[in-house]
Amino acid sequence: ICFQSLILDMAGNVGTQSLAVTIRVLMDENLTASDKLKLTVKEMKVGFSNGILLGVMAVIFVALYIFLIKGNDIAYSFIVSGCVGFSLLASMVISSLIGTLVPMFFNKMKIDPAVASGPLITTINDLVAVVTYYCMVWLLLINMLHLT
């Protein structure tokens, strides 16, 4: 639970940024399906790149925190921090995808994506981040490694 806010905040930031970029691109009326696909892939690449960078940083700093401050052994520290880092990566990629697809969906339905997308993106990204984090903890730490 200690690192839940880190994952939630970063997923929210990435999703909101993807939302802003997508809404700006959707202002072009001549946007083709190919352009939308390219935008989606580009935003996922950005989310993945940011997720890798921040995930690695999270692994290092969380492991140091658990090892030095909490006094656990180094293997345990890196196992737990790896779970945090991977959850951060996964939630950032998924949030960037959602932040791109939701405004496209609203635009297709003839609803202004700038008005309708914000609260929905925030809620969905929070849910995705929490579910991703707890699923990783459940899969990696509890089921596979029997750490509780």
What are these regions (language model features)?
Residues 1-97, 101-113, 123, 136-148:
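Alpha-helical transmembrane segments and their membrane-interface boundaries
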